[in-house]
Amino acid sequence: MKAFKLLLLSSLLCAVSAMAQDRKFVSADDVRPASYAGNMKRFRALIYYSDQVEEAHREFTHQAIGFFRKLTVGDGFILDVDTRLPEDLTPYDVVIMPDVAPGNPEERARFQQYMENGGGWVGFHAAGYNDLSTGWPWFRDFLGGVRFRCNNWPPQPGLMDLESRTHPVTKNLPDRFVSPASEFYQWTPDPRSNPAIEVLVSLAPENFPMGLKDIVFGGDFPIVWTNRNYRMIYLNMGHGDECFSDATQNLLFVNALRWVVSTSPKGDPFDK
């Protein structure tokens, strides 16, 4: 018995040693020193939202505003919050839309011009909603040529699959995670069919059938994607008051913000 224990211990030590050799440890002396912003504001962001949306979307927006405000602790960046889209969007490195996209012609034209001139966008859930009555062809193309098809109901957690281990938004996330309860939109045509779209996260097939009242039975179900023609990312999460209860999903949100800002034509503010 004693010999067996010694053999087992020896095997474990060998395994740990092999794992240590496989991992590449880099000395702190060989890594670029930390960058402190000091009095410098690295970038400026705008949260554009509506107070005229359904309760579950108001709940998400209220929490989203609090979440992103906490990220400004230490004055690392400036965050403005408004229900109107400013006439001049050029000062903003990113516009965050938690619950709605512009609805009137003036704001739509303003946002389109901003994005076509290198602006940044982080959109959640209902901010991407569009159907046959929306009447904004550019925005539909901006999202990948898609419109709303269906959704699960009631809101429920969803098992997510990562589709990229190299993209900055997902490279430090687990291969799978459970997204807190939400209503998830499925789209037509499939965003993946557009060569300009890069899908980063999708709903795992094990979720189906999904829903009790409104049931989604299957099919490809992208959740997070980017349009390579713009500096943007769309995240399907954003319904109710549970979306910020998961650390992995919160990291996804931070990564999304950081990535969009880091690709600014003004230069990467995190590299200063």
Region spans (language model):
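Sec/Tat signal peptide C-region and signal peptidase I cleavage site
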Residues: 16-20
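Short, solvent-exposed loop/turn segments at secondary-structure junctions
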Residues: 52-53, 86, 102, 128-129, ...
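Catalytic beta-strand/loop cores that center a nucleophilic Ser/Cys/Thr
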Residues: 24-30, 36, 152-229, 233-234
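A glycine-rich, often tryptophan-bearing local segment used as a flexible ligand/cofactor-contacting loop or short
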Residues: 101-175
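Helical hinge/lid and interdomain linker segments adjacent to catalytic or ligand-binding clefts
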Residues: 46-131
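Bacterial N-terminal signal peptides
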Residues: 7-15
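Positively charged n-region of N-terminal signal peptides that target proteins for export
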Residues: 1-5
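Extracellular ligand-binding/catalytic regions of CAZymes and related secreted enzymes
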Residues: 21-42, 67-70, 206-223, 227-272
